[in-house]
A protein has these predicted regions:
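Loop-to-transmembrane alpha-helix initiation sites
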Residues: 37-41, 142-157
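Central hydrophobic cores of alpha-helical transmembrane segments
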Residues: 14-21, 123-135
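Membrane-proximal helix-loop-helix units in multi-pass membrane proteins
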Residues: 34-111
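Internal/C-terminal transmembrane anchor helices
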Residues: 177-202
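Membrane-helix boundary connector in multi-pass membrane proteins
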Residues: 30-34, 116-125, 134-147, 167-176
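Single conserved hydrophobic/aromatic residue that forms the stacking wall/gate
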Residues: 2-13
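Helix-loop junctions on the outward
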Residues: 11, 22-41
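Juxtamembrane "helix-exit" motif on the non-cytosolic side of transmembrane helices
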Residues: 25-33, 83-93, 136-146, 199-207
């Protein structure tokens, strides 16, 4: 079956790449000079932009609509709008309000996009997004941005879905450990990550009251 992206999906690839490059070049390099390690953060998003370009060029159709996980995906699609509402509820005003085009908002939207069109997930991009969620969790503590719990909470079920689909796609191949063991290990890993997120959230409850 032809897995090359349709014209519509090709436009999605281009917009996602441009958005990632915008975050890298404008958000971090141009306006984020005062932030520590802004160049590394810019490189992180530039690499993700390159992944979208790579998928487009080699016609790796990592976005093919399957109608799986639609409810969860729609929830994540709404998160970029929830972010500023969350900021307003915390009493923030512009420019402290988290906007829909900030890194964590874009990361949540991208996770939703990959869930809604998850016939063939780019596992490298999924790993980058999972890593960004961990970075976002640290920002809750160091920068007092509890909005980033939205990304941290969404990544645990998404992580399980991404890697479960990846394991299933290789189910017919001889692997060590077996797919059943890999799936069990994945469940344990997600439980551990989810428990650590929950512990961090409970530990930082005083941060919510102080903001």
């Amino acid at each position: 079956r032809d897995r090359s992206p349709s014209r519509g999906l090709g436009d999605v690839y281009k917009r996602q790449a441009m958005l990632n490059f915008w975050i890298a070049g404008i958000y971090y390099l141009l306006y984020g000079e005062q932030r520590e390690h802004n160049d590394m953060l810019a490189l992180f998003w530039a690499i993700m932009g390159c992944i979208w370009v790579y998928d487009l060029v080699v016609k790796h159709a990592s976005l093919q609509r399957t109608h799986n996980h639609t409810g969860f995906a729609l929830l994540l699609f709404a998160m970029p709008l929830v972010y500023p509402l969350f900021s307003l509820a915390l009493g923030r005003t512009f420019p402290m309000v988290t906007t829909p085009v900030m890194p964590c908002s874009v990361a949540v939207f991208t996770i939703g996009l990959m869930l809604a069109f998850s016939e063939r997930i780019n596992i490298v991009l999924a790993m980058f997004l999972c890593h960004w969620a961990l970075i976002g969790l640290s920002k809750v503590y160091f920068f007092g941005i509890p909005e980033d719990y939205l990304l941290a909470c969404s990544i645990v079920p998404a992580l399980y879905i991404f890697f479960r689909e990846y394991i299933r796609s290789n189910e017919g191949r001889p692997t060590k450990p077996s797919p059943r063991v890999l799936n069990a290990l994945l469940v344990v890993l997600c439980i551990i990550i989810g428990a650590s997120f929950a512990f961090t959230m409970l530990h930082q409850l005083n941060l919510f009251t102080d903001v």
